[in-house]
Amino acid sequence: MRRKRPELPEVFVGRDAVREGALRPSDLRGPRVRRLFRGVYCPTGVRVSHELRCRAAALTGEGTLVLTGRSAAVVRGVDLASASDPVDVIALPGCRVNRRPGLNVRRVAIDAGDHQPWEQIAIARPERMTFDVLSTGPLVRAVADADRILRAKLTTVARMASYFEGRHDHGIVRAREALALCDPRAESPPESKLRVRMHFAGLHPEPQLQIYADGEFVARVDFGFEEERLVVEYDGEWHGQGSAIARDRVRQNKLRQAGWQIHFVTKEMMVNPDVVIDEIYGAVLRARSARAHHF
C-alpha cells in the first residue's frame, strides 16, 4: 500500500518538505506550489496575503530578523499592507539575509527591548513599529497609517512622544513631524490624508466635530469650520449603499436647517488633491463672505 504523503503547511521551506517526503524536488518547480521567497513556498490553493508573506519571511531569517513597520502592523491586526507589498524587516547583527524581491531588509540599530519573539524571528513592539511607519514612505501616507494604528489602540500619541524623547535615530525628525499631525479620531485613511493636506494649505477645521442646534444634537461631521459654519465631508463608497442614501439626505437637511453649508469630497476627486484643496479653500471663503453679509 502506498504511503500517504504528509500534508503541506500553509508556508514551508522547500528542502524540508522534500526531506520529509511531502514533495519531490521536481514538485518545487511544478503547479502544486507557489514560491514566496527563495526556498520558501506555499501550496497553490492557499490565498496569499501580506500576513502569509510575513510568515514566509520568518522562515528565511533564522532568528536574525525583526518584522516591523507596516508588516508588523498587519500581524498585529491593522491592515496597512497588501499581498503585493514587500515585507519590512530589520536585520539584527550577524544576519546574512540580504534584500531580495518581496523582502525589504534594513540594517539599522534596534534596541533589544524594542522587539519580542514571533514565529521563527522577532516582531517589533508597537512603539518601534509605529516609529518605522512614521519615518518611512510619503508623509501623508505615514500619518494616515499611524492614525489607524492609534485608532486600533496599539499605542498612543503620549506613548509615542515618550518613546521619541532623547532619540537620535535616522528618521526621528521626520517621525516627530508626522506624529504631530496624527489624530486617532480619523475614521478612514482618506479622511486622514485630506486632513493633512488641508493642514499644509493653512486650513484647520475641527475633525469629527459634533454639531448641536438649540441644545440638540444634529450630526457628527468629518470636518467642521465652526466660524464659517462649513462642513467638509469625505463621501466614501458606503454612502451610495441602500438606505444610507436616505439617512444621508435627512442628515444633510438637518445640517442646512441648522445654518451649516456642506462641501463634499469624493474618492474620485482625491485623484487630484491640489484641486480638492483649492475647492475647499474657495468654499471656506464663500462661507465666510456669506456669514459676513448675514450679520
Residue ranges with predicted function:
Residues 1-171, 285-295:
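Short gly/ser-rich loop at a beta-strand->alpha-helix junction or flexible surface loop bordering the NTP-binding
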Residues 16, 20-22, 150-295:
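Surface segments flanking catalytic/ligand-binding clefts of nucleic-acid enzymes
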